[in-house]
Amino acid sequence: MTLEERNQQVRAFFNGKIDTYDNVHSEYMKTKVLLAESLDKYAKKILDLGGGTGLELIHLFELFPQAQVTVIDITENMLEKLKTRDFAGRVTTICGDFFEVPFGKDFDAVITTSAFHHFKKDEKIRLLKKILGCLKDGGQFINCDLIALTAEEEAAQLVDLENNIGYSKHVDIPLTIENEIDALEKAGFKQITSGNGGKENYGLFIARKNISHIS
Ligand SMILES: C[S@@+](CC[C@H](N)C(=O)[O-])C[C@H]1O[C@@H](n2cnc3c(N)ncnc32)[C@H](O)[C@@H]1O
């Protein structure tokens, strides 16, 4: 299955989950809140990749009421739900695939949560390079995502992916912390840190484009 086909499978999956998504993900609020809490204080122009129904933006707009947020997401039903939130007027939504849609430029920060564990490492490096290109110098990339706890788990999920052809449900293929960091380094990010992402199997990764601003 190609990356494009897998991304369409992800889209079909989330389009079908819209009635239950927010309830299921209320358990994951800590993983979402960490994004806003990790942002530089001056952050204003923010790109949220895979923002879905906007759960991470609830806390973000409390902390950053002046933020201008762009959300790119492939799943139209998720974005329709986001558009019903009271902060929707402060969000620009773009419905499309990360690998195809132009990101724009000069963002203070790019954030993402629970959205990048659908990509193989080489695909992720490609995406990270695209993110680097849309950040201001010193800008932040913050990713809170599912991780593989061991190299064996990472490898096993890749095997599941290869065996998944023809099935309707997408397969999660999270990387280990070490591979997440290596992907960020290979893409050209600096000042990379990692920590717990609010659940045992979630990692929080923060990295910068070049030099850091005073936050
Ligand atoms: C688990 S949801 C997370 C939504 C939100 N960030 C949250 O934490 O509640 C993953 C989101 O990533 C989006 N997504 C996954 N792969 C994508 C891709 N290739 N391009 C654009 N959006 C994608 C999905 O459509 C979905 O809305």
Model-derived segments and spans:
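Conserved alpha-helix/loop element of class I SAM-dependent methyltransferases that forms part
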Residues: S26-Y42
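Core SAM-dependent methyltransferase catalytic element
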Residues: A187-K190, N196-S215
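Class I SAM-dependent methyltransferase Rossmann-like catalytic core
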Residues: T2-M29
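A short glycine-rich, Lys/Arg-flanked "PGG" loop and its adjoining helix->strand segment in the class I
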Residues: I125-D137
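C-terminal alpha-helical "lid/dimerization" subdomain adjacent to the S-adenosyl-L-methionine
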Residues: C144-A187, I192-N196
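Short catalytic micro-motifs in class I SAM-dependent methyltransferases
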Residues: S114-A115
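Class I SAM-dependent methyltransferase SAM/SAH-binding core
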Residues: L47-L49, T53-E100
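A conserved beta-strand element that flanks and buttresses the S-adenosyl-L-methionine
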Residues: I111
